[in-house]
């Protein structure tokens, strides 16, 4: 699974996931499914934000990369992917500026158009079950919840899906692609089932010993939203050649 993650996701997303697991004292060599889940969640959050801006009239518009406008403001503030201290600093700043209610748990995004925090969920199970779990944990009507599944289903607070259909379809397609690529490598069952995951982990560790010197192909594309995080953790030279486009897992 670890090899798959490094092949399928952009190196910047992988690096953020590694830092997140390290911050919580988790070993990605052991918890490979969580490593994959974190990378997937990060990518969905960035794709959610991609290309969405607010113009001078306060209207939400979509602007593709290559059509810049200095007067435009990003519609979404990305909170996910930051270290906890910085994330809470951003949340506090938003609350002080907008008067929004401070959430009990760190949300993933803030929507400046709708003036609300957003919790993004990506589930391998039924969307309604995961939605209820999120709602019970957050216990706040102020935080908007939007759940995606690997089967193309989604569920959101009051059926308000925030994004246009095309933007959501891009996210669903990416998730379906990840599922297909996992399945083609025999990883999907272990990603869904904890019991199967333990068996797969033993197999992976044994395989890593045999293939430690094998070269690995890496996707070099990235989400434009990642560039917003860039100053915090990497220099611009490493992102200069990355194209902002929808990621696709490379074939073996």
From Swiss-Prot:
It holds the Pfam family Flu_PA. One of its GO terms (biological process) is viral RNA genome replication. Keywords: Decay of host mRNAs by virus, Eukaryotic host gene expression shutoff by virus, Host cytoplasm, Host gene expression shutoff by virus, Host mRNA suppression by virus, Host nucleus, Host-virus interaction. One of its GO terms (molecular function) is RNA binding. Plays a major role in the shutoff of the host protein expression by cleaving mRNAs probably via an endonuclease activity. This host shutoff allows the virus to escape from the host antiviral response. Hijacks host RNA splicing machinery to selectively target host RNAs containing introns for destruction. This may explain the preferential degradation of RNAs that have undergone co- or post-transcriptional processing. Residues 208-217 have a biased composition (Polar residues). It is found in: Host cytoplasm; Host nucleus. The record marks 195, 198-199 as: Important for efficient shutoff activity and nuclear localization. The probable endonuclease active site in the N-terminus and the basic amino acid cluster in the C-terminus are important for the shutoff activity. The C-terminus acts as a nuclear localization signal. The C-terminus is recruited to host protein complexes involved in nuclear Pol II RNA processing. Transmembrane segments: none annotated. Gene3D superfamilies: Influenza RNA-dependent RNA polymerase subunit PA, endonuclease domain. Belongs to the influenza viruses PA-X family. It comes from Influenza A virus (strain A/USA:Huston/AA/1945 H1N1). This is Protein PA-X. The record marks 28, 65, 202-203, 206 as: Important for efficient shutoff activity. The active site is at residues 80, 108. InterPro entries: PA/PA-X, PA/PA-X_sf. It comes from the Viruses. Residues 202-221 are annotated as: Disordered.
């Amino acid at each position: 699974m670890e090899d798959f993650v490094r092949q399928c996701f952009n190196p910047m997303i992988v690096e953020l996931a590694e830092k997140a697991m390290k911050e919580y004292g988790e070993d990605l060599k052991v918890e490979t499914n969580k490593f994959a889940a974190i990378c997937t969640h990060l990518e969905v959050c960035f794709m959610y934000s991609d290309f969405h801006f607010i113009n001078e009239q306060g209207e939400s518009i979509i602007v593709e990369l290559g059509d810049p406008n200095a007067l435009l403001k990003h519609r979404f503030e990305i909170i996910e992917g930051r270290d906890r201290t910085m994330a809470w600093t951003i949340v506090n700043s938003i609350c002080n500026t907008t008067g929004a209610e401070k959430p009990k748990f760190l949300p993933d995004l803030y929507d400046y158009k709708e003036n609300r925090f957003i919790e993004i969920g990506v589930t391998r199970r039924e969307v309604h079950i995961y939605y209820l779990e999120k709602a019970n944990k957050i216990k706040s009507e102020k935080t908007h919840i939007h759940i995606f599944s690997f089967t193309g289903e989604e569920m959101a607070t009051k059926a308000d899906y925030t994004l246009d259909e095309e933007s959501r379809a891009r996210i669903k397609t990416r998730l379906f692609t990840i599922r297909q690529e996992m399945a083609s490598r025999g990883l999907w069952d272990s990603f869904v089932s904890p019991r199967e995951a333990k068996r797969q982990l033993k197999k992976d560790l044994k395989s890593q010993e045999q293939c430690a010197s094998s070269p690995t192909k890496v996707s070099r594309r990235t989400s434009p939203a990642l560039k917003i995080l860039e100053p915090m953790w990497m220099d611009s030279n490493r992102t200069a050649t990355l194209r902002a486009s929808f990621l696709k897992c490379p074939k073996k």
